[in-house]
Design a protein with these regions (language model features):
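Conserved acidic segment of CheY-like receiver
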Residues: 7-27, 38, 57
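Active-site beta3 strand of CheY-like receiver
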Residues: 52-58
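Receiver (REC) domain switch/output surface
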Residues: 117-132
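Active-site residues of response regulator receiver
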Residues: 14, 60-61, 88
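Receiver (REC) domain active-site loop signature in two-component systems and cognate sites
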Residues: 51, 63
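Helix N-cap/capping motif at the beta->alpha junctions
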Residues: 38-47, 68
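PAS/LOV and related PAS-like sensory modules
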Residues: 3-6, 21-25, 98, 137-162
Length: 162
């Protein structure tokens, strides 16, 4: 098993280090492919994103100096396709609406039980699997276009609906 190909690298931004550690423990219990790096601010998160490739960002909303929505907007400017999950205890319809407008991949409210980590782990798995499938489809499309552009053979495309 190739650990790099199967691992899921997650950047978790939360200004409460103890909670971030708890999240990492629960997520890794749900899926041992998860590699979680925690940061305590959006600016630290942006620095880490510029240094290391991640498969997904999970962020709190209520952080000092820059909110989770502002962090999301900064991530979208630089990494428009990177899955971003807002995982917050300060949720409201307004926050959810702002997150959707800013291009959040998913939104999940923190709860008091451990079931929330099962849901969060599932959502991380889903968004990273979807992104990887999209990237693979793009690579296949690019290779196919290169093959057809450089081929001396005639390629016939049939549309059954025409």
């Amino acid at each position: 098993m190739d650990d790099n190909a199967n691992s899921i690298r997650i950047l978790h931004a939360d200004d409460e280090p103890d909670f971030a550690e708890l999240v990492a423990v629960y997520l890794q219990r749900e899926d041992d492919r998860f590699e979680i790096e925690s940061v305590t601010s959006a600016s630290e998160g942006l620095d880490r994103l510029s240094e290391t490739a991640f498969d997904c960002v999970v962020s709190d909303h209520d952080m000092p100096s820059q909110s989770g929505i502002e962090f999301l907007e900064a991530v979208r400017e630089r990494y428009p396709d990177l899955p971003f999950i807002l995982f917050t205890g300060k949720g409201s319809e307004e926050v959810a609406s702002d997150a959707i407008s800013a291009g959040v991949t998913d939104y999940l409210q923190k709860g008091s039980g451990t079931d929330q980590y099962v849901v969060l782990a599932n959502r991380i798995q889903n968004v990273t699997q979807k992104r990887r499938a999209e990237q693979e489809a793009e690579q296949i499309q690019t290779r196919l276009e290169a093959i057809t552009a450089n081929s001396n053979d005639t390629i016939l495309t049939v549309d059954d609906e025409y």
